[in-house]
Amino acid sequence: LFRSISLGALLGVSGTGSCHELTHRVNSPFDLWLGRWDFALSFGTNFATEHVYGHHKNLGLVGRDPVSPKRGTGFYTFLTDGQLEQWRNGFGIEKTRLEAAGKNSLSIHNRVIHAWLRGGLVISLVFLASGWIGFGIWFISALVSKYILEGLNFFSHYGLIRLDGEPITSRNTFSSCNPVGNYFTFNLGRHGTHHE
């Protein structure tokens, strides 16, 4: 159990920070590919689509940004509802993109479907390589990692709203200038700067 939690903390802190930065490099196919596969290790497969093309566009807009919890929302409610909404938004983004290109939204061109396939492949490989015990260790570590990622989202955006049409500024997120935390999370604590 301790090893699972330790691995989850490693994936959730340093892994999430590096994956997050790599998925923003949409003009670098290798970096994007690496970030997406890295997120597949910790149930973050949809992140590269919804985060980059949804959250950054709709930051703080109530009802359109599932990563910005409304004031009064509890963490576990945010965890479940926010996840479902992130998947729904990811599919919506892909549906719009693929329909504009004249392609079926449920085709192999859908990046969210790619994300599910990556996640399924990781789960299968972990199980085949290490059986139920290894799968259990990985599963717990992936959950810990996902909780850390969503905790960062929760505390970076909690209760902050932005009006439609208002520009995104550093005041639309909570930030931390702690040098140790920023070192381990690739400056993810400086969240306002990231969104500007």
Predicted regions located by residue number:
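Membrane-embedded catalytic scaffold of the fatty acid hydroxylase/desaturase
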Residues: 5-118, 161, 167-196
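Alpha-helical transmembrane segments of multi-pass membrane proteins
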Residues: 12-16, 141-149, 153
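Transmembrane helix irregularities
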Residues: 41-42, 129-130, 147
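Hydrophobic, membrane-inserted alpha-helices
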Residues: 118-126
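Interfacial segments of alpha-helical transmembrane regions
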Residues: 131-144
